[in-house]
Amino acid sequence: YAKENEVSMGNSGNGAIWHLAAAGLAKETGAKFKHVAYDGAAGAITDLLGEHIDAVAVSYAEVANYVESGDLKVLAVMNDKRLDAIPDVPTCKEAGYNVVLGTWRGLGVPASTPDYVVEQLYQIFSDAAQSDAFVDFMNKSNNVIDIMDGPSFEDRIIADLDTYKALVTDLGLKIQ
């Protein structure tokens, strides 16, 4: 349908992560999206619920209540693995599209930080991220835990930066 017809795709703002994610999905699939930018995801979700737009690109946490109530349906996730909260929903990769885009969070320190301090911080935060309280919080808020060491996280940032730069260029946006 989306390859033959334009789909109005709401997102959280021009150049925002979910605008870029939808652009990546369109690029990979050949779908035609009319990007409808909002000031945050809430307006896009409200307009989707009111059937004023056809779809949204947002994090699952932002729509979980509507999915659980049956008001919205998730077609695919842009993560590299399925989400525990919606295990029957495939990833884009499983659907045949190389789209792994989204948000992440991490801890950074100055480059001059001694290695032993970096290792201690990694261990402290790694242990905390595996604690029952944190895992429970992340599960309840429908977020994914992906613990990476410094070099792995740096690789992820660099790879994502390359992807997002290409999407920004494709969209004709200026990096500021």
Please identify what each model-predicted range represents.
Residues 27-31, 68, 113-176:
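An extracytoplasmic/periplasmic, membrane-proximal ligand-sensing/linker region
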Residues 1-43, 92, 97, 104-137:
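Hinge/capping helix and adjacent helix->loop/strand transition within the periplasmic-binding protein
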